[in-house]
């Protein structure tokens, strides 16, 4: 849910020159995100394999590193997959209770990445209204959530 909502919001904000890339575990998920226009590219791979994620991420972004990476997973050992594709002075947003912040900090230092790391706490002011507003804006996303969760 969180990943789809982040993709939707990112697509609204990046403008005509932006590039929203999602990392998913299977082709079915990639096809779903693409069919719903929630990303420009969907990479199939495991966030526990940071080298693979880096290679695939750069391949769909013209060889350029990213400004922002948002990690939304429920498995450990995904920190470096979020950090490696991000440019120096870029931002990595960790929105996962599985994140090991010592691994993230030491990993970024070890590979020479000067990135801003933000810890998401699951709350932002007016988050419920923002979510409902986005579901009102996107009937396809609302319908998907209703079928899956109601």
Regions found by a protein language model. Give the residues of each.
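Glycine-rich phosphate-binding loop and adjacent beta-alpha segment
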Residues: 73-138
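C-terminal capping/lid region of NAD(P)-dependent oxidoreductase domains
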Residues: 63, 133-150
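Short, surface-exposed basic-aromatic patches at helix termini and helix-loop junctions that form
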Residues: 9-15, 34-37, 84-87, 108-112
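Proline- and acidic/polar-enriched loop/turn elements at helix boundaries
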Residues: 22, 122, 147-148
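A general structural signal for well-ordered secondary-structure junctions
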Residues: 17, 39, 116, 140-142
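N-terminal Rossmann-fold NAD(P) dinucleotide-binding loop
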Residues: 3-7
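Adenosine-nucleotide cofactor-binding segment
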Residues: 11-77
């Amino acid at each position: 849910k969180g990943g789809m909502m982040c993709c939707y919001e990112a697509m609204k904000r990046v403008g005509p020159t932006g590039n929203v890339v999602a990392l998913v575990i299977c082709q079915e998920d990639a096809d779903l995100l693409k069919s719903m226009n929630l990303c420009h590219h969907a990479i199939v791979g495991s966030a526990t394999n940071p080298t693979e994620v880096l290679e695939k991420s750069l391949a769909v972004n013209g060889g350029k590193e990213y400004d922002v990476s948002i990690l939304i997973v429920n498995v450990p050992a995904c920190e470096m997959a979020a950090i490696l594709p991000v440019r120096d002075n870029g931002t990595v947003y960790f929105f996962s209770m599985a994140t090991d912040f010592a691994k993230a900090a030491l990993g970024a230092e070890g590979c020479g990445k000067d990135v801003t790391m933000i810890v998401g706490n699951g709350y932002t002011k007016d988050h419920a209204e923002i979510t409902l507003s986005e579901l009102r804006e996107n009937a396809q996303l609302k319908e998907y959530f209703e079928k899956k969760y109601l």
